[in-house]
Amino acid sequence: MSTGGHVVAVTCLALEARIALGPGVSVICNHASKLVASLEAAVKQGASGIISFGIAGGLAPHLAAGDWVVGSRVRTEQGHFPTDYRWARTLVDALPGAVH
């Protein structure tokens, strides 16, 4: 994705949405049935990136609350889709201690 525009944070919980929302960040919260349409609209409106944002801590035993996890792919019922490598590297380099 390009470097201009805003980032869209996709969340499940209202608490996560409140944490993620800020300057340059819009939020799509708990819209599973409308997620694709909402993301397509955000891209048409100039979104430069999409992140999945959550506060769950049970991903792996070696992770603690507050750890940054940068994914390399997205898994859906339709298969696995790679994330943007350059953007992932930029995030890993910018976030202290990020796990990729």
What spans do the regions from the language model cover?
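Glycine-rich phosphate- or other oxyanion-binding loops that anchor nucleotides, phosphorylated ligands
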Residues: 2-100
